[in-house]
Design a protein with these regions (language model features):
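N-terminal secretory signal peptides that target proteins for export/translocation
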Residues: 1-9
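Bacterial N-terminal signal peptides
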Residues: 14-23
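Proteolytic maturation boundary segments
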Residues: 27-57, 170-245, 249-250, 257-268, ...
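M16 family metallopeptidases and their MPP-like homologs
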Residues: 53, 58-87, 99-153, 158-164, ...
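Well-ordered alpha-helical segments embedded in enzymatic catalytic cores
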Residues: 394, 636-640, 788, 858
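Alpha-helical scaffold elements lining the catalytic groove of polysaccharide deacetylases
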Residues: 629-633, 637
Length: 879
């Protein structure tokens, strides 16, 4: 059997054949994962493929897509201009669109353009995508099918020879995902398709793998002043189309993810050992699911320019170690477990967007990608029974087939260093790794001393937690546990939610608050560096994260439900056996200025600028400002955590899992006395947050046109107001998106209902320029000021904005369905239970009834308040 034409394919063949499972059916001589039952596929009489997805998580809405396997380079007589022109023409006026452009038809029913507009043309495909179309009226569905078929039928009436040759119905697929009945939709499309005759399909260019025997080095300009970046990319041959729906891509993707985790961790460790500060270390890979060309694996490292030569040596030495088979077996086992645990958590979160379904179906049509659910893939991958030694051998085979200092390698770097020197430094360090001696100190669970517990019976007050339908246990010390029982994939999730955030730290500089969480782990925990402690618990299947916000601190994670003793011991050790690690702090603070420079100009910085204009005197911002980072922050953070962890009764430990409550309580109770408590509760500091009144506008010059608008208004956060605010944000998003259609701008609307320091509704609109290629030929990119005029027209009319009852009802269904799905996520319950205990807010109890009571008038009332609140506009006009 021909599997692939290089050593990489041979390296993967063995694990593929070893991993047969009952969840698969056999095809193409390799096991095929069972397709998602929610996806109905077929071929219409005229040859057009179809994919219909019934998605119960999104009510009243659907995504419509048309996928064509014609792009800018996969047909014999194409050019990028021809393919793009054909795509834009398809969004214009067609015979069945009643004299208006296709994009206007979909926009009139709520369709929102993506970041590429309504269409994207790639090397091998053209993908039209209309997001969030409101389909509550049956005639909308019928009209949408007619329009899509009209787009398919252009081939039969086109005078353009390019269109008539390369856009046959058989070269196209219609995808519908949303609140639809798949069987009914398929039948309707079949009836309509009889109006469109089949046309012969022309053959496409075949993929050809081109091996490179020597590396290419490219010197590129610096993107950020003073920061030099080194990127190594290995091109890999594609997975043959016949095997794309088999288990091979899933296995290969897992191995590449593990390879990236290994390289990233080893590079970071190497840079730290040599005291080389870094701005970024990341690995990535592109598979045949994501591209029509070669697959690839990449490593990127960004450092200060004067450290660049040394960083190149570290990167090459790490890559050489992995190539020569020096990956540690315990490191690989830990990373595999972490990777699978992350995937299992995603399975518990069943809120699949229509867009995700559209992408999966498009990949199936274009590349023969698998239609299997994530759960099916995870069950298969987690069900593998391979010894760690076998896993390591297979990993080493794949790694050595990919990594090479010359073959199929392209290096791009941005530093004032001659190419020959870069190449020599890289090659020499790689070769040096052949004699690597691993003297790394690796800790294990045996290095974590278990806690000595007193088996003393205590009286526990038990009552029902009505919001979660769980149990609340209160111990004599005042320590509280809330347990929510639900399916959790064999895990026990925990969240120690405490009153006390960075606003309680005295003399905190503006821009320091966002750093506080990191200092929890810039310590030694249980006698070892915190980083090593986290590796030890990760190897045992446990995670632990810390997030300190403005007024609360959350210490959360998960562990195997059969390992509760390890979970509780490790949590308590992390809380009370911490010591400041001066070396870790010093290195961290040397990296932060570089990371800050790398963040410059990003979306977070833009949001921070707008918020700073809105409330200039507010110093408790979450955005990180390295220039404000003081040497005293480490001690302040240490003292802060020591203080709040002595008052754990001023909070709640939330547990979410599927153990019998009596068994859990018996197991957990001996550990409760180890949590320190106090008779004095935490006092929230007085934090002044008063946005400037009125409407302010700031204009600057930049690289590309963009608009950011922030709006803030006081709002009593009752459950009724919370639901109405959610619906109002959806209405505003729809109205703005509709108004902006044809301007060439892409809208992102975010909002938050803020409880502290005062109850408010905050909205943020971000408009970014999209290429005209993503819209109809009638679309001409508006300038920033023209787009701003459109936004102002909508926002200035919020007091009297037209709000249809149809939209409100659809969005109510959408909100209800979204909350129902979120409740299957353990983190949802940890968040809402902590909010009720720490902030006294409950938006979950009777949520269905609360949503039902939202009216058009209530939504208008929320929008009217926005008209009265604070507004800031930040406009960037391209130079």
């Amino acid at each position: 059997m021909v599997f692939m034409n290089n050593s990489l394919g041979k390296s993967i063949l063995l694990p593929v054949m070893m991993l047969l499972s009952s969840v698969m059916v056999m095809a193409q001589n390799l096991p095929v994962l069972t397709p998602d039952k929610a996806i109905k596929t077929g071929t219409l009489p005229n040859g057009t493929s179809y994919y219909i997805v019934s998605n119960p998580t999104v009510k009243g809405l659907a995504d419509f897509a048309l996928v064509q396997n014609t792009g800018v380079s996969n047909v014999t007589d194409t050019s990028s201009a021809q393919a793009v022109s054909a795509a834009r023409g398809a969004l214009s006026v067609l015979p069945r669109t009643s004299g208006r452009p296709v994009q206007d038809f979909f926009a009139s029913h709520g369709a929102i353009p993506g970041k590429d507009g309504f269409v994207k043309v790639t090397d091998n495909a053209t993908q039209f995508h209309f997001h969030d179309v409101i389909i509550s009226k049956p005639e909308v569905l019928d009209s949408a099918f007619l329009v899509l078929m009209d787009m398919v039928d252009r081939v039969s009436r086109a005078d353009d020879g390019f269109i008539s040759r390369w856009y046959a119905p058989a070269d196209q697929a219609i995808v519908v995902a949303g609140d639809v009945d798949a069987a009914s939709v398929a039948e309707k499309m079949k009836m309509i398709s009889y109006m469109i005759p089949p046309v012969p399909s022309a053959p496409r260019k075949e993929y050809v793998w081109e091996q490179k025997d020597s590396a290419s080095y490219i010197c590129a300009p610096q993107v950020h002043d003073g920061i030099a970046t080194f990127t190594a990319v290995w091109n890999l041959t594609r997975t043959p189309r016949a095997y794309m729906n088999t288990v091979q891509p899933a296995i290969y993707d897992l191995f590449l993810t593990e390879l990236g985790m290994v390289v990233e961790e080893y590079v970071k460790t190497g840079l730290r050992q040599y005291r080389i500060p870094y701005a970024e270390v990341k690995c990535g890979h592109v598979t045949s699911m994501q591209s029509s060309g070669d697959e690839s694996f990449s490593v990127t490292v960004s450092v200060a320019e004067d450290e660049f030569p040394y960083a190149v040596g570290v990167v090459a030495e790490v890559l050489g170690r992995v190539d020569f088979g020096y990956t540690d077996i315990s490191d690989l086992a830990r990373m595999k477990r972490t990777c699978l645990d992350d995937m299992k958590l995603q399975v518990l979160r069943p809120m699949f967007s229509n867009s995700e379904y559209v992408e999966r179906c498009a990949t199936s049509f274009l590349h023969n990608g698998s239609l299997a659910t994530l759960k099916t893939k995870v069950d298969f991958l987690a069900g593998r029974v391979l010894a760690d030694t076998t896993e390591l051998r297979l990993f080493n085979n794949i790694s050595s087939a990919i990594l090479d200092p010359e073959k199929n390698l392209t290096v791009t770097y941005s530093a004032a260093m001659p190419e020959e020197q870069v190449k020599n430094a890289f090659s020499n360090a790689w070769a040096f790794a052949k004699d690597f001696k691993d003297d790394t100190k690796r800790y294990t669970a045996a290095d974590v001393e278990p806690l000595e517990l007193e088996n003393v019976k205590v009286k526990v007050v038990e009552k029902t937690d009505h919001m979660s339908n769980g149990l609340e246990w209160t111990f004599p010390s005042g320590f509280k546990i809330v347990y929510k029982r639900m399916p959790a994939g064999g895990k026990m999730y925990f969240n120690l939610a405490l009153n006390g955030g960075y606003s309680a730290i005295g003399n905190l500089a503006k821009g320091e608050g966002g750093y506080v969480s990191d200092y929890f782990k810039l310590t030694r925990i249980g006698g070892m560096p915190a980083e090593d402690f986290m590796k030890v618990i990760a190897a045992a299947g446990m995670s632990l994260d810390v997030h300190t916000g403005l007024n609360t601190t959350m210490i959360s994670g998960s562990a195997d439900e059969g390992d509760l003793d390890f979970m509780m011991s490790s949590l308590l050790i992390a809380l009370y056996e911490r010591r400041k690690d001066d070396e870790a702090v010093k290195y961290y603070e040397s990296c932060e200025p570089l990371r800050s420079a790398l963040r410059a100009g990003g979306a977070d910085e833009m949001t921070a600028k707008v918020n700073d204009i809105m409330c200039p005197d507010y110093k408790y911002v979450s955005y990180r400002m390295a220039e404000r980072l003081s040497p005293e922050l480490a001690d302040k953070a240490m003292n802060f955590y020591d203080t709040i962890l002595k008052k754990t009764n001023d909070g709640v430990l939330i547990l979410v899992g599927n153990l019998d409550p009596s068994v859990l309580k018996k197991k957990i109770s001996p550990y409760v006395d180890c949590f320190e408590t106090s008779d004095v509760a935490f006092r929230k500091p007085l934090v002044r947050y008063q946005p400037a009144s009125g409407w302010s506008t700031y204009t600057v010059e930049g690289e590309r046109n963009s608009i950011d608008v922030a709006m803030s208004v006081p709002l009593a956060l009752t459950a009724d107001n919370f639901m109405a605010a959610e619906i109002a944000a959806m209405v505003l998003n729809k109205n703005l998106s509709k108004a902006l259609t044809g301007t060439g701008m892409y809208l992102t609307l975010s909002h938050e209902c803020r409880v502290y320091p005062n109850e408010r509704l905050n909205l943020h609109l971000a408009l970014n320029e999209v290429s005209e290629d993503g819209f109809s030929v009638e679309t001409v990119n508006a300038g920033a000021m023209e787009a701003l005029a459109v936004v102002r027209k909508v926002l200035s009319g919020t007091d009297g904005m037209e709000v249809s009852s149809e939209d409100v009802e659809v969005f109510k269904l959408r909100l209800k369905a979204a909350m129902e799905q979120e409740m299957k996520d353990p983190y949802y319950w940890m968040n809402v239970i902590s909010r009720r205990h720490l902030a006294g807010k409950d938006f979950t109890t009777n949520y269905q009834a609360r949503i039902k009571t939202v009216t058009v008038d209530k939504v208008k009332s929320i929008l009217s308040k926005l008209e009265e609140g604070s507004k800031v506009e930040y406009i960037v006009i391209s130079k």
